[in-house]
Amino acid sequence: MTRLVSKLAVALALAASSAAAADVTLLNVSYDPTRELWRDINDHFIPQYKKTKGDNLAIKQSHGGSSTQARAVIDGLDADVVTLASVIDTDAIAQKGLITGDWVKRLPSSSLPYYSTIVFVVRKGNPKGIKDWPDLAKPGVEIVTPNPKTSGNGYLSFFAAWGSVITRGGSKKDAVAYVTKLYSQVPVLDSGARGATTTFVQKEIGDVHLAWENEAHLEVREAKGDLDLVYPPVSIRAEPHVALVDANVDRKKTRAAAEAYLKYLYTDEAQEIIAKHFYRPINDAVLKKNAATFPAGIKLFSVKEIAADFAAAHKELIGTGGVFDTIYKPKR
């Protein structure tokens, strides 16, 4: 993972130098563990844009906890596109008038080029025997997961844990008892997904990491045998939508480039890149072609199976005064 961080530093330096000579520059504001995906997408899209449009294009990237990133855009971060962890963060920007209300309908599959889920990363040999969500509440199991108030990984992990009870017949009372026990065994809440990875991998804190599926694959690959990937029987279907930031692209006159960029995500080439980075492509043919990467045994439940919609889940579970606020006691 240290090597991964070093590669990212080099990539950011190269991106900065290329931006200086660009005719058009886009800023993609995304959630935390998507750096490698977007760098690869950009490397393929930029030459095509030059060939078809004749303009030199540069694409800058900004990454952090998804909710934190949404707040940054609201506060003035000049994003041309946002590729955040869920509809709730994009809607937060739309509610401030920066994105038009019909944004979900602009692109195929409700502006969803891929989807993902939350899985477990454990120490070599899985010494704590972690196979399913109830195992996380066993005495002596330390869980690493980001803060659900700031991170898409964080709130999706909370929703997944909650849903693992509700979708299998448990009551809300059962779910509250479960997440209370689980979060009492979380030693630290990092602000974003990549910070949680650092805590688990480099600092060697915790027995299990609740991670985005793509991040889990990266961790295991970089660890070279020291970590294992565990798919629980059920988890949440995570849907990271993409959108133009209308107010910014119109002011900067970058709408055409930004639209072309997002439309490219639905091409077969981009869908293959998405699969290569362990995200589940929305194109069924590409998904089937890469079936070996994505186990079919895990049941992915929709947020609508635990609440009326994403906004309702957010309000009830992690909003101010919600379940998380009542059950979580920070470690001192």
What are the residue ranges of the model-derived segments?
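Short beta-strand->loop
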Residues: 29-31, 122-124, 142-168, 182-186, ...
